[in-house]
């Protein structure tokens, strides 16, 4: 049997529907915890414990005195001046690549309700402007197999700039898999962020110990330590003023319906061309 369980935000409705979770809104630390994430209210059944953010990983050694691209126009200039040095991964094999593709498609087209449960054909038609961007840059950018592949190529000097998860980058640096000189930033045009949540199983054999552990997990000191060691975004309201370099995500990942559609269209419109 399970005591404390970690979930993605997308898994929460299923767990709640199955009545598999116990209420945690009376934990001592609940007031300072984050319980609304990615437009989802956990309704007292879970708390966020791990925040993550996509952005760009880069190699300062290779970048030299070049300015980091902050706008899509600046990114285009960088790509034009440094062909094949910008890479992004297949969206079917890593969220960082999908995050970048979503931003291109969204900014080149019109805004829409990406959380909608059904896909509007008019929205998908507007994505053509985004696919045209990829077609125009086909010979100047590198498509990698996965997020890990992107960071390996960045580490080896093949790439200078690539979309990445911040916690993925920091985690690989901690294990020595990639060089500690590599850095991360979120460009001004925005990249989506998210996080994971923790809850207590309704049939937990150790409910008191589970509550003690979960309350410890959301404390400011614990969240700060997780951030320092693993690169996660702290999930505690007391720590929010300190997050100038990792802003609260204002850009959200697409919901399930549009994410699935985007990946299908990417294969047809970009990979098969």
Residue ranges and their predicted role:
Residues 151-152, 211:
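Alpha-helical segments flanking ligand/cofactor-binding loops in enzyme cores
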Residues 12-14, 161-179:
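A ligand-binding cleft/hinge motif common to bilobed small-molecule-binding domains
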Residues 2-142, 148-149:
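Extracytoplasmic ligand-binding site segments that recognize negatively charged/polar headgroups
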Residues 15, 153-155, 200:
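Hydrophobic residues within well-ordered alpha-helices
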Residues 252-273:
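Conserved C-terminal helix/tail region of periplasmic/extracytoplasmic solute-binding proteins
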């Amino acid at each position: 049997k399970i005591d404390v369980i970690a979930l993605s935000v997308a898994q929460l409705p299923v767990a709640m529907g199955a009545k598999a979770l116990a209420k945690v809104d009376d934990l001592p630390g609940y007031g300072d915890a984050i319980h609304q994430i990615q437009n989802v209210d956990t309704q007292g059944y879970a708390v966020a414990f791990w925040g993550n953010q996509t952005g760009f990983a880069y190699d300062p050694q290779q970048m030299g005195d070049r300015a980091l691209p902050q706008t899509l126009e600046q990114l285009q200039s960088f790509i034009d001046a440094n062909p094949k040095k910008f890479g992004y991964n297949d969206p079917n094999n890593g969220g960082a690549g999908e995050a970048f593709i979503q931003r291109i498609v969204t900014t080149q087209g019109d805004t829409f309700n990406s959380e909608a449960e059904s896909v509007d054909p008019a929205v998908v038609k507007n994505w053509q402007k985004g696919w045209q961007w990829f077609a125009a840059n086909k010979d100047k950018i590198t498509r990698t197999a996965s997020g890990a592949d992107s960071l390996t190529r960045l580490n080896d000097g093949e790439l200078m700039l690539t979309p990445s998860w911040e916690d993925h980058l920091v985690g690989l640096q901690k294990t020595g898999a990639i060089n500690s000189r590599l850095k991360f930033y979120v460009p001004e045009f925005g990249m989506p962020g998210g996080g994971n949540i923790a809850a207590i199983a309704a049939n937990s054999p150790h409910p008191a110990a589970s509550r003690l552990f979960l309350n410890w997990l959301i404390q400011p000191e614990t969240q700060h330590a997780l951030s320092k060691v693993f690169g996660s975004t702290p999930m505690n309201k007391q720590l929010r003023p300190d997050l100038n370099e990792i802003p609260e995500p204002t850009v959200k990942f697409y919901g399930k319906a549009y994410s699935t559609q985007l990946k299908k269209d990417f294969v047809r419109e970009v990979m098969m061309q």
